Structure formats: C-alpha cells, structure tokens
C-alpha cells in the first residue's frame, strides 16, 4: 500500500513543489479531470501538513469522505481543500488522500484545523470504521450506536434482519 510512497512517477504540481521545498513528506498522484492536484500523505504526517496547508491559505475544507479501495485492501480518507481569497475567479484546490490498513485504521483528526471536519469525519467513521484520533466527539452519526460493522466496506455482510423501531 505505502511501499511505493517515496517513488514519484507523477508530475509535481505547484503545491507538491511547495511541500517538497519545505521538506514535508508526500507523494504526488497527478491531477484529476478538473486539474485539481492530488497528493498522498502518510497518516503520521497529516497533522503537520494540514497546519502547513492552512497557514499557506487553504482555509476551507470543502469535503471530506472515505472509500474502501478494494475488498480486503486499504481504506482511504480523502480531503478536498480550497484556498478561498478575495477577488479570485478560480480558487486553488488540492485533494489529499490518506491510505490506512483496514485492520485498526487510524488517522489523526484535523477537526482542530478545520472545524467543518466534525460531522464529515464522524460520517466516515460511521460508514467505514476509520478512527480519527483526537476527534472530540467520534461516535456514530447515521447508524444506531448498537449497529455492528461498517456498511460501506466492500466485505460488509448485510444482516438478514433489521429491527425497526416506531418513533411513537
């Protein structure tokens, strides 16, 4: 999963070059179809890189989500950051991907950098089981607290019986 982390085969963008000039470890993954630069970050490096990006002007966490890469494989947490500035027609964006093993998946929470990560990290925890360390209220947000398993994992087995509770 991360054994190719230091091998760079993608073209570096502006943000990747800036991170490299500041000796911040990352791996460029190229650009998406809209031209947004995508970077891979290791979980242990995420807090310092998140703060560096925030200080560099990426003041808006547009979206945080997660996905199961393939059955039995790693889980991914994805962050879309935007540099919101006055009088800018095209705001600068970056996509950060963090891959973790499905056994004991842990990533440091960036709630303390971008408050909008609160519910988004909770939803990813609820659906995929990625634990966001130091999150102030990491508990299920969509599923009942008694729910077993992580519904968006590709190896999730749907229960045969659901107990429906009447609201009245």
Curated annotation (Swiss-Prot):
Its EC number is 7.1.1.-. Pfam families: Complex1_30kDa (PF00329). GO terms for cellular component: chloroplast thylakoid membrane. Its main location: plastid. It is a peripheral membrane protein. It catalyses: a plastoquinone + NADH + (n+1) H(+)(in) = a plastoquinol + NAD(+) + n H(+)(out); a plastoquinone + NADPH + (n+1) H(+)(in) = a plastoquinol + NADP(+) + n H(+)(out). GO terms for biological process: photosynthesis, light reaction. NDH is composed of at least 16 different subunits, 5 of which are encoded in the nucleus. NDH shuttles electrons from NAD(P)H:plastoquinone, via FMN and iron-sulfur (Fe-S) centers, to quinones in the photosynthetic chain and possibly in a chloroplast respiratory chain. The immediate electron acceptor for the enzyme in this species is believed to be plastoquinone. Couples the redox reaction to proton translocation, and thus conserves the redox energy in a proton gradient. Belongs to the complex I 30 kDa subunit family. This is NAD(P)H-quinone oxidoreductase subunit J, chloroplastic. It comes from Chaetosphaeridium globosum (Charophycean green alga). The lineage of its organism: Eukaryota, Viridiplantae, Streptophyta, Coleochaetophyceae, Coleochaetales. The gene is ndhJ.
């Amino acid at each position: 999963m991360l054994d190719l982390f230091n091998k760079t085969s993608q073209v570096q963008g502006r943000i990747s070059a800036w991170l490299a000039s500041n000796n911040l470890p990352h791996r460029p993954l190229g650009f998406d179809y809209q031209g947004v630069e995508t970077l891979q970050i290791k979980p242990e490096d995420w807090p310092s890189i998140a703060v560096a990006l925030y200080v560099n002007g990426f003041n808006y966490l547009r979206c945080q989500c997660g996905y199961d890469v393939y059955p039995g494989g790693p889980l991914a947490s994805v962050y879309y950051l935007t540099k919101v500035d006055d009088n800018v027609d095209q705001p600068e964006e970056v996509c950060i991907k963090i891959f973790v093993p499905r056994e004991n998946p842990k990533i440091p929470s960036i709630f303390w950098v971008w408050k909008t990560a609160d519910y988004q990290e909770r939803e990813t925890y609820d659906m995929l089981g990625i634990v966001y360390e130091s999150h102030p209220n990491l508990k299920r947000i969509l599923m009942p607290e008694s729910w077993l398993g992580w519904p968006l994992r590709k190896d999730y087995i749907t229960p045969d019986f659901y107990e429906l509770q009447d609201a009245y």
